[in-house]
UniProtKB/Swiss-Prot annotation:
GO molecular function: penicillin amidase activity
Active site location: C4 (nucleophile)
Protein known as: Penicillin V acylase
UniProt-listed Enzyme Commission number(s): 3.5.1.11
Activity regulation, per record: Hydrolase activity is rapidly inhibited by lysine modifying reagents.
């Protein structure tokens, strides 16, 4: 299983931010990647068709196959996006539909970030493609995916490949997880509109005065498991009621706090094969600064890469390896016994 949760927020100083978790049973050889302008990105593995990208972008991904595969990222125009698992619902074609171009599902994020500015551009681009059932070389199959994008205006969309083609959800609440589709998750929210940060009122039963045991009773009923539907509800609830950030730093802090509600420790979620599904990394990004932030399962320090600090016309990819060592700040002197 490859899980994932994502959300977008807006700060009071009009910064648009996006964040996601990456939950998986294996760690691909991932790193932070800056793809410069005109680098050239494939559409398919089986055909040597390369599209030069107009815009540079940064995000988390892999360089283990022919073209860089990004799982999420932000481009120089402030468009942000991510791929998320869409098991049993994603539908891919065997051949391109008439008038469209075939694309491997894992290259969608790279192609979109490399060539789009707004969510309107994303919709136009993706409706010109047919997502093909072409296996990923590393996984050995075409992973079932859906996609979410947020632009500098703050609008978030969800793109889902299904039996009817591509379904586009506009003006979403800016939250997404995994299967089922976005519309189902949005409808499911209606069953939880009574969940609130406010404490319930005391009530009388005869002469008995009943009071809550403590703070937080207004959240009773919010599910605590790790299913996609439960994670969607928790992220939506935390997003709605978390105090609004004043600036980018506060926004990034809020994003990591909100997504901590769906972080999965090793051993808590197991597959049918007994493998552990866990949160490998959590990332956040800002449309205005083009900064990309992340922290790892093994190292909870927030690291950052600034897209605009690099040569965006470079001929080569710019990569940043993971530092997996836990970064603990020691506040007093440690005596080493001789």
């Amino acid at each position: 299983m490859l899980g994932c949760s994502s959300l977008s927020i807006r700060t009071t100083d009009d910064k648009s931010l996006f964040a996601r978790t990456m939950d998986f049973t294996m760690e691909p050889d991932s790193k932070v990647i800056i793809v410069p302008r005109n680098y050239g990105i494939r559409l398919l593995e089986k055909e040597n068709v390369v599209i030069n990208n107009s815009y540079a972008f940064v995000g988390m991904g892999s360089t283990d196959i022919t073209s860089p595969v990004l799982y999420d990222g932000v481009n120089e125009k402030g468009l942000m996006g991510a791929m998320l698992y869409y098991a049993t619902f994603a539908t891919y074609a065997d051949e391109p539909k008439k008038g469209t171009t075939g694309i491997n599902p894992v290259y969608v994020i790279s192609q979109v970030l490399g060539n789009c500015v707004t969510v309107d551009d994303v919709i136009e681009k993706l409706t010109s493609y047919t997502l093909l059932n072409e296996a990923n070389i590393i996984l050995g199959f075409a992973p079932p995916l859906h996609y979410t994008f947020t632009d500098a205006s703050g609008e978030s969309i969800v793109i889902e490949p299904d039996k009817t083609g591509i379904t586009i959800h506009r003006k979403t609440i800016g939250v997404m997880t995994n299967s089922p589709g976005y519309e189902w998750h949005q409808t499911n929210l209606r069953a939880y509109i009574g969940v609130t940060p406010n404490p319930p009122q005391d009530i009388m039963m005869g002469d008995l005065d009943l009071t809550p045991f403590g703070q937080g009773a207004g959240g009773l009923g919010l599910p605590g498991d790790f299913t996609p539907s439960a994670r969607f509800l928790r992220v939506a609830y935390w997003k709605k009621y978390t105090e609004k950030a004043k600036n980018e730093t506060e926004g990034v802090t809020n994003l990591f706090h909100i997504l901590s509600s769906v972080n999965i420790p090793k051993g808590v979620v197991l597959t049918n094969e007994g493998k552990t599904d866990y949160t490998i990394y959590t990332s956040a990004m800002c449309a205005q600064s083009k900064n990309y932030y992340f922290k790892l399962y093994d190292n909870s320090r927030i690291s950052a890469v600034s897209l605009m600090a690099e040569n965006l016309n470079s001929q080569d990819l710019i990569t940043f390896e993971w530092d997996r060592k836990q970064d603990i700040k020691q506040l007093n002197q440690v005596n080493v016994m001789s």
